[in-house]
Design a protein with these regions (language model features):
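Small-residue-rich anion-binding loops in enzyme active sites
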Residues: 1-26, 169, 176-179
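Patatin-like phospholipase
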Residues: 10, 16, 21-29, 34-143, ...
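A general structural motif
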Residues: 23-25, 54, 168-170, 239-240
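Short active-site oxyanion
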Residues: 53-56, 216, 321
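Hydrophobic/aromatic beta-strand patches that form the interior of the parallel beta-sheet core
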Residues: 58, 174, 242-246, 322-326
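Active-site gating loop/helix substructures
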Residues: 132-238, 245, 252, 257-262
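C-terminal helical/tail subdomains of lipid-metabolizing enzymes
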Residues: 135, 142, 150, 155, ...
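Acidic, Ser/Thr-rich peripheral helices and adjacent loops at domain boundaries
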Residues: 257-299
Length: 390
């Protein structure tokens, strides 16, 4: 299924061609969120057509899968491969032929989510048989409900890992070491990446078994941190960074009215990325680093080898960071099952919302006209009033 070409996206591409900059790092940061990940694919579609291709993609869980599909293909094929993946995983429940009102849509979504729990997702995972309680103790089959062998086959078919490991587009994915509880990033700038690293980033227990890599076992990175933003901000660099942070769970929300609402709200809070906290910390760090740099320049030469001075001089003082924050905002008929509800209808809605939100952001005068200063951290969250976000 080919996504319809948006006329607004076409006009934006022409209007903002001059805005694309090759003197900056364009970084796409993708949060985990299961079936909601189609939103990220839509964001990427608008980003690549309107602004530019990313130079670095970092992801957790479903964000790691989308990141691999992007970095593991040439620029002209990336949207096609993303579409192929999302069409595959949403193929079990095609779009209904009739328009459904909100109550009916809630019912359709719950049927879809129940089908996933019972039968799995094509090209992604399938139920184990016999079930885990009847499997030999200590085996992967005994500690997970689903088999992710289909995902490995899908990744190896749709992703060129040789391209990832030799490409100028950097890939970073996060997972947690089951034995130590420590977070671990797998980064193509530092090591070879294969399907295991992507699967490890998305191995959420108890649904999926941990993935073994070099004698250690890894679970979904979302258990510790559901976004790689801090990792990206912590890496040294001299060029301006424009970071597009794509979240699938909103930190803010309404007071729950039912137990089902409680479950959904708890999940949103648990997996939301705390982007503002990360960017505030980065701003504070930059202010301190730049003050230290100015102070050191005022010191006489005989003090510049002092250990305390050397320690201060090692504090990074990078160039500016712009963080463009896009957040998927749940539709009123979605529930706590939204991250494992893989119907074709929902997938297409998520994709369309991401595409519209990214286009809206790139067209917003607050983004188009903002001053690109040489230092500091600037945060843009421009989709709260976007029609696709309601």
């Amino acid at each position: 299924m080919t996504p319809p070409r948006s006329t607004s996206a076409t006009s934006l591409q022409a209007a903002h061609a001059s805005s694309s900059r090759t003197d900056e790092d364009c970084i796409l940061v993708l949060q985990g969120g299961g079936a909601l990940g189609a939103y990220q694919a839509g964001v990427f579609e608008s980003l690549s057509k309107v602004y530019r291709e990313p130079t670095w993609v970092a992801g957790i869980s479903i964000g790691a899968i989308n990141a691999a599909l992007i970095t593991g293909n040439p620029a002209h094929a990336r949207i096609t491969k993303l579409r192929e993946f999302w069409d595959l995983v949403s193929s079990a429940l095609p779009t209904p032929m009739i328009h459904a009102d909100a109550p009916a849509r809630e019912g359709l979504n719950e049927v879809s989510a129940s089908q996933v729990m019972l039968f799995g997702v094509p090209g992604f995972f399938k139920p184990r048989f016999p079930p885990a309680p009847f499997q030999p103790r200590g085996t992967p089959e005994a500690i997970s409900y689903y088999d992710t062998a289909p995902l490995r086959a899908t990744l190896e078919r749709l992703v060129d890992f040789d391209r990832i490991n030799s490409s100028a587009v950097r890939l970073s994915v996060g997972a947690v070491n089951v034995r130590t509880g420590n977070f671990q990033y797998f980064d193509s700038a530092k090591q070879a990446i294969d399907a295991r690293h992507i699967m490890a980033s998305g191995a959420l227990p108890p649904g999926f078994a941990p993935v073994e890599i070099d004698g250690e076992h890894y679970w979904d990175g979302g258990l510790v941190s559901n976004t790689p933003l801090q990792y990206v901000l912590d890496q040294p660099g001299k060029r301006r960074r424009v970071v597009f942070q794509v979240d699938l769970f909103a930190a803010t929300g309404n007071l729950p009215a039912t137990l089902a609402d409680v479950t959904e709200r708890e999940k949103d809070i648990r997996f939301s990325s705390r982007t503002r906290m990360n960017t505030t910390n980065e701003l504070d760090r930059q202010v301190i680093a730049q003050a230290a740099k100015r102070l050191l320049a005022k010191l006489p030469a005989e003090l510049r080898d002092d250990p305390d001075v050397l320690a201060l001089s090692s504090v990074r003082s990078d160039s500016a960071v712009d963080v463009v924050h896009l957040i998927y905002r749940s539709k009123h008929y979605e529930s706590q099952s939204k991250d494992y509800e893989f119907s074709r209808l929902s997938m297409q809605e998520h994709w369309d919302s991401g595409r519209a939100d990214m286009a809206h952001t790139l067209h917003d005068p607050r983004w188009v006209n903002h001053e690109r200063s040489a230092s500091g951290v600037h945060v843009f969250d421009l989709t709260a009033d976007c029609p696709s976000s309601t």
